[in-house]
Amino acid sequence: DAFDFVQDEAEKFVRKNGAGSENRMIVSFSGGKESTATADVVIKALANPKITHLFGNTTLEFPMTIDYAERYRKNHPLAEFRIAKNTDQNFYEVCKEIGPPARMMRWCCSMFKTGPITRVLNRKFGDKQILTFYGIRKNESVSRSKYSRVTENTETVKIQKQTVASPIFEWKDLDVWLYLLSEKVDFNDAYRLGYDRVGCWCCPNNNLRAQFLSRIYMSERSEKWRSFLVDFARQIGKPDAEEYVDSGKWKARQGGNGVAAAGDVK
């Protein structure tokens, strides 16, 4: 049927693009449903349970994601499971210096995700051109719909010296769930709680539904973050700080706005 074709096509894609790259290949593992499905497709297509997985722990992951990553690791004992984490900087301390991240100023990605991941890759592979199997789908967002299924050293590849191949690029949301459930693949419990996407719990790109759920399931973190944002709004002179935060206007910030060090952000 149609889904069998989708699954078979993804496995053929992995075998074709993975040929000759066995010693310089990784699966990018985020703990989300797409990366979980991708990892399973890659392992089965290559019949290689030892493939390296790289998990970027931004320190802002859902607690459920950390639990799931550990569970995944135990369920795949032959896989080399590496963790990239920024242990030098604290998210809140950086926010105090340069202001919280916003949709147009996501400094957190380079500092807490791509930077640590690049360091791990450099330690493992040096100057080798590596192949990364990535769990992105073009239906996830407008920006991702502009990606190519195989991309090499372009601006859309955030970490250089790698070819990014996306086996499930053409899959719809339903295809991902059909795969996970039919193949009996364990997945992140955050989805069972109602989240439709899994990432950083305080990301300015999170929708209202995710924010609502986080107030329920991560109430202490959510309240601490809201208090910080309200204090920040007062610091930069917003007349109604609570309304500025609760309406989501903080996400649209585009410049330093009263934060001296914000000009250092690249």
Question: Which positions does each model-derived feature cover?
Answer:
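Nucleotide-activated chemistry modules centered on ATP-dependent adenylation/adenylyltransferase
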Residues: D1-K266
